[in-house]
């Protein structure tokens, strides 16, 4: 039984499901599409930053260095590393008693 295709209706004897055990191809297709939609939605919410970054920039990791002399490549790498390095002098150590 799928929660996506069940329809409960009141009868004299209580509640019962009309579509229980249905082998209608339309019901089966709707169930499969619903389950796939749910899976894709969950994956999108979990990995949306990665997915959209991949769509926007592709698999590029940074600007191309093709045709650039090695000395300039090294200078660029050093600038990037300096931008990432953190100066420990900006932090204040607080000790709780």
Swiss-Prot record:
GO BP terms, alphabetized: protein complex oligomerization; symbiont genome entry into host cell via pore formation in plasma membrane; symbiont-mediated suppression of host autophagy
Pfam families per UniProt: Flu_M2
**Miscellaneous field:** When the channel is activated, one or more imidazole moieties of His-37 probably become bi-protonated.
Query: Which residues does the entry place in the Virion surface compartment?
Result: 1-22
Extract one GO molecular function annotation from the record: proton transmembrane transporter activity
Subunit structure as annotated in this protein's UniProt entry = Homotetramer; composed of two disulfide-linked dimers held together by non-covalent interactions. May interact with matrix protein 1.
Site (Seems to be involved in pH gating): give the residues: 41
Please name the HAMAP family in this protein's record.
INFV_M2
**What are the transmembrane regions?**
23-43
Q: Where in the cell is it found?
A: Virion membrane; Host apical cell membrane
Protein name per Swiss-Prot or TrEMBL: Matrix protein 2
The gene for this chain is M
Any one cellular component term from GO for this entry?
virion membrane
Q: How is its activity regulated?
A: The M2 protein from most influenza A strains is inhibited by amantadine and rimantadine, resulting in viral uncoating incapacity. Emergence of amantadine-resistant variants is usually rapid.
Q: What does this protein do?
A: Forms a proton-selective ion channel that is necessary for the efficient release of the viral genome during virus entry. After attaching to the cell surface, the virion enters the cell by endocytosis. Acidification of the endosome triggers M2 ion channel activity.
Question: Which parts of the sequence are annotated with region: Disordered?
Answer: 60-80
Q: Which InterPro entries does the entry mention?
A: Flu_M2
Assigned keywords, A-Z: Disulfide bond, Host cell membrane, Host membrane, Host-virus interaction, Hydrogen ion transport, Inhibition of host autophagy by virus, Ion channel, Ion transport, Lipoprotein, Membrane, Palmitate, Phosphoprotein, Signal-anchor, Transmembrane, Transmembrane helix, Transport, Viral ion channel, Virion
Task: List the stretches on the Intravirion face of the membrane.
Answer: 44-97
Per the UniProt record, the site (Essential for channel activity, possibly by being protonated during channel activation, and by forming the channel gate and the selective filter) maps to 37
* Entry comment, domain topic: Cytoplasmic tail plays an important role in virion assembly and morphogenesis.
Family in the record: Belongs to the influenza viruses matrix protein M2 family.
For this protein, the record's Gene3D superfamilies field holds: 6.10.250.1640
Phosphoserine occurs at which residues?
Answer: 64
Entry membrane topology? Single-pass type III membrane protein
